[in-house]
Amino acid sequence: MRHYEIIFLVHPDQSEQVGGMVERYTKLIEEDGGKIHRLEDWGRRQLAYAINNVHKAHYVLINVECSGKALSELEDNFRYNDAVIRNLVIRRDEAITGQSEMLKAEENRSERRERRERPEHGGHEGLDGDSDKADE
């Protein structure tokens, strides 16, 4: 069996169906003796260019080890599912199990956003209060 990295984009109006689609696709691979090494739901993202007048899509990344038969069946599912607007299958030399760069960047962004929104109580307030007392 070979290793593949699969990314597919789902129409934003069908985002609520992504969970069922992922479940169906992983079941297809596992029933054929394949293995899921990594599964990441990147959520809705802006497209670099419009596809059929759609400017956003729901991204899903799956790293699998599967047979050619399972892969061709998966590609057929992508082709005949109107909700999947694009897909990309890349053959890899080995299984990739770590977090993707895309997910790491998203986590870093959310951490920075949380730090920015969370008020700091580290001593900035004390300095302002002391200067007010000194003026009296």
Swiss-Prot record:
Gene Ontology terms describing biological process: translation
A single Gene Ontology CC term: cytosolic small ribosomal subunit
Keywords for the protein's UniProt record, in alphabetical order: Ribonucleoprotein, Ribosomal protein, RNA-binding, rRNA-binding
CDD domains for the chain: bS6
Cross-referenced SUPFAM superfamilies: Ribosomal protein S6 (SSF54995)
Region ranges (Disordered): 99-136
GO molecular function, one term: structural constituent of ribosome
A family per Pfam: Ribosomal_S6
Recorded family membership: Belongs to the bacterial ribosomal protein bS6 family.
HAMAP family assigned to the protein according to its UniProt record, in alphabetical order: Ribosomal_bS6
Summary of the function given for this chain in its UniProt record: Binds together with bS18 to 16S ribosomal RNA.
Protein name as it appears in the record: Small ribosomal subunit protein bS6
